Amino acid sequence: MKLYKFIPAAALLLMASCSEDEMDRINTDHGNPPIDVINGRLMITDAITSTGFTTASGGYSYYASVYNEQIFGTGNNQFKNAELRQISEVAGSSTFNNVWNGTYATLLNLKSIIAKCGEGGLNSGQKDLLGMAQVLAALNWGILTDMHGDIPCSEALQGGALKQPKLDTQESIYKYIFALLDDAIANLTEAKTKGMSNVGDQDLLYGNDNSKWLAAAHAVKARYKLHMMKRDANAAAEALTEAQAAIDAGFDGMVLDIYDGTESLMSPWQAFQYSRDYCACTTTVQSLLKDRQDPRENVYIYYYSAGDEMDPADPDYQAPVCGIPGDETMAVLSGAWSLSAPKWLTYNAAGDYPLYPTATTHILSLSEVYFIMAEIQARNGADCTESLSSAINANFNDIKTFGSISQSASEYVASLSSRISDNPVKEVMVQKYLSQCRDEQVETYNDIRRCKALGEEFITLTNPKNMNGSSSRWPLRLPYGNSGVSSNTNVREAYGDGLYVFSEPVWIFGGTR
């Protein structure tokens, strides 16, 4: 009898236990598992995509293109404000908040991947994955500090554990970048030697080709060594060594080619133009092209829509109209359709969809590496024509995606012989400026500031709004993101009223922070 008394109680206990287990299962978000159980190889895909889409070719690139006069800002909104150098846009903390947050989110992802590759981690011993993450981390930290100077780094990315991370000096961040790259080179060398393939097709850049990642690590190191020319007498020679190492290892560019052309997966620059119509050609670029009879002019200076194209032989021919930097009448137009656009940003004949929505994104191009070599060779008094031809040829191959080019790179460089003879460094920098007009404007912005720090000016910026009386309105750096300014007192104090962007260069380019 006692036995039967316990059976209902046991059944109730079992039901309660099952119900509790079931509720635990129901309350678990199986569609979004916690980050600690996700394999790092799956996370690297997002890190690659966001590095290209957000950090290398997002807000930083868009605004830098206007400051560099590679794009004319129109549309009577944000880009108009940037074109006219309005303080609220150029120095405002809201301007770069999205890309500031997006880059830190990418770095948090990469931090987790690197941790998973450590001893006892989910991806322990996977040197290929670790090396990839370290290269991408170096790139993201590099762009973030190049744009903003001193930033939260060593204490950042800790969530609620540390809500007020300190600002690290740019000097210390650069040391960290080089440490990341040295470790990446060692890890990728080991991965290559051992034939590791832990990432597979989750690697959207190279399909887990460790040799290509190793070459990319050297290319990234060459870029950041070049940035150090103002601060380190050995930086130029080291940049040349790393650039040559990248080429010798088979570097062919860090190029993101993932877009299907739909509205949900369109190349970032094309998506930006499609949503805003802010981007037109500039007379600054046009003049440089015309002065050199540059064969890229028909691609760089085009119509808003392919349907607007006219034959120059047509008696009613109207040439594309470029924006004049700082021209308020042009800047306040309701959209770029009243002006010209580079062909890669043009619309189809119907004028209702981008003509090239699948255009690739350069995280770091092959032409950039050859330009680094050409610049250092020119500065050393060596013959730079071979490297310069290779740099321009790499750019021509990219631009041919959008239109025909009537000359070969070697023929074009031959036509520049007198310019190269007169001032080889200047011509290299002009050619680099022109070659980076499509989606590499962040590095152009760095070049202009780097040369300025060295007492050089090879690109003549013509926007009269760069000065307001005796006060500069051309930004020597970009303002911090609003999330940092509003939530971190250290960032808020560094930001102040934002006007420091007009007077204080970042440390690598001669400033103090």
PLM segments and residue spans:
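Sec-dependent bacterial lipoprotein signal peptides
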Residues: 1-16
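Membrane-proximal, proline-rich intrinsically disordered regions
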Residues: 18-73, 120, 345-346, 452-513
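Short acidic (Asp/Glu) and glycine-rich catalytic loops that position anionic groups and cofactors
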Residues: 23-25, 405-411
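Structured, solvent-exposed acidic/aromatic patches
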Residues: 34-41, 75-399, 403, 418-425, ...
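Bilobed periplasmic-binding protein-like "clamshell/Venus-flytrap" ligand-binding domains
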Residues: 58-59, 434-450
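Flexible, acidic glycine-rich loops studded with aromatic residues
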Residues: 362, 367-372, 378, 384-405, ...
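Extracytoplasmic gating/loop element in the C-terminal half of outer-membrane beta-barrel translocons
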Residues: 412-418
